[in-house]
């Protein structure tokens, strides 16, 4: 008997996933292939007690801009500037989408950029391999900020996110072997501390609306984890498995919506999964690309879900079959997000701690 994981692993992306038609500034897509992908989304053997009810997004994904990323990641919405920032890790750059005009600006970076975070003074925190830097999009200046402990060769930062008090959590990884040599760090002001070692691919860093729950994934362990989180001290509680995925799909980047549900981009599985706080799968959104990487809510009312994607290591046939691989996508999923937390240059803002 062929399992659902084998079915998806052997999926033939030999035909376009969505039929494309042009509208001003975007490409929209019909979704006839969704019916074919839905069985995989519905039957992959997750350790869940509930029935999974896949449902498509309220509107099909739309391409934003014409750029193609090798490994798009770390989307963050800046509500002050009404723009979305994200990175291309492999072709090192920070990108900015102007929501009003639709224009995309690109700033090349000097080294692999794992992730970014908003800063309370309007700049961006940038996780480079041997330096956590500050980037100012107003004048394109890049300033050294914190030098982490020396990383072994071929190591880099990957996913990162600020907690509700303004600490920056970021994980490192081996860029080639993905061996369990990575470290999860927490940055408070200019003080960087190692919290956890033995990480393969750090991902899915996110926090519940009240900041009392922290989420994290080590992608190659095919699990999403949750922790009680003390915002006053920045200390994680005991680890518990929120949900597990089945190869070939593994958890990549996440965001939390205003209802407290976790949206996770499942790399290699062509889908976004919305998890309830108890780990129950609430919704599955089929994507037109095999490798969604991360997601973030944006727009004037935080009603648009932006999704970064990857085109790396794809054959010519795969690229032809998935013309949106590497694109920034936008869709309406019927819920709103939360404002992105900003890094506090002067240290954690403890007055921002909220009770459940």
Residue map of PLM features:
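Hydrophobic alpha-helical segments and helix pairs
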Residues: 141-195
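A short beta-strand motif characteristic of beta-propeller blades
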Residues: 60-65, 102-108, 143-150, 191-197, ...
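Short loop/turn segments immediately following beta-strands, especially the blade-tip
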Residues: 227-234, 333-337
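A short loop-to-beta-strand structural motif that recurs across blades of beta-propeller domains
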Residues: 93-95, 131, 183-185, 223-225, ...
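Conserved beta-strand positions in repeat-built beta-propeller and related beta-rich domains
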Residues: 78-79, 84-89, 125-130, 168-178, ...
């Amino acid at each position: 008997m062929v399992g659902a994981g084998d079915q998806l692993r052997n999926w033939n992306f030999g035909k376009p996933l969505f039929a494309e038609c042009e509208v001003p500034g975007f490409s929209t897509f019909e979704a006839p292939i969704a019916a074919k992908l839905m069985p995989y989304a519905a039957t992959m053997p997750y350790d869940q007690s509930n029935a999974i009810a896949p449902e498509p997004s309220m509107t099909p994904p739309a391409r934003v801009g014409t750029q193609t990323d090798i490994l798009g990641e770390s989307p963050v919405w800046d509500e002050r500037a009404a723009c979305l920032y994200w990175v291309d890790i492999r072709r090192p750059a920070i990108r900015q989408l102007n929501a009003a005009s639709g224009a995309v600006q690109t700033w090349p970076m000097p080294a692999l950029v794992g992730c970014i975070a908003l800063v309370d003074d309007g700049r961006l925190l940038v996780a480079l391999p041997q330096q956590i830097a500050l980037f100012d999009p107003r004048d394109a200046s890049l300033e050294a900020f914190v030098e982490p402990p020396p990383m072994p060769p071929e190591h880099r930062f990957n996913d990162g996110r600020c907690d509700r008090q303004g600490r920056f959590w970021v994980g490192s990884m081996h860029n080639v072997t993905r061996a369990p040599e990575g470290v999860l760090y927490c940055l408070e002001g200019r003080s960087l501390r190692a919290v956890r070692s033995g990480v393969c691919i750090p991902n899915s860093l996110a926090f519940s609306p009240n900041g009392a729950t922290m989420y994290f994934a080590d992608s190659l362990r095919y699990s999403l984890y949750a922790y009680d989180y003390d915002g006053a001290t920045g200390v994680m509680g005991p680890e518990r498995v929120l949900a597990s995925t089945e190869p070939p799909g593994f958890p990549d980047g996440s965001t939390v919506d205003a209802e407290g549900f976790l949206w996770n981009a499942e790399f290699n599985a062509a889908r976004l999964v919305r998890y309830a706080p108890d780990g129950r799968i609430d919704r599955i959104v089929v994507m037109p690309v095999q490798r969604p990487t991360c997601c973030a809510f944006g727009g004037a009312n935080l009603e648009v879900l932006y999704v970064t994607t990857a085109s790396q290591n794809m054959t010519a046939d795969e690229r032809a079959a998935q013309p949106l691989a590497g694109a920034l996508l936008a869709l309406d999923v019927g819920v709103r997000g939360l404002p992105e937390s900003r890094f506090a240059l002067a240290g954690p803002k403890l007055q921002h701690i909220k009770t459940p």
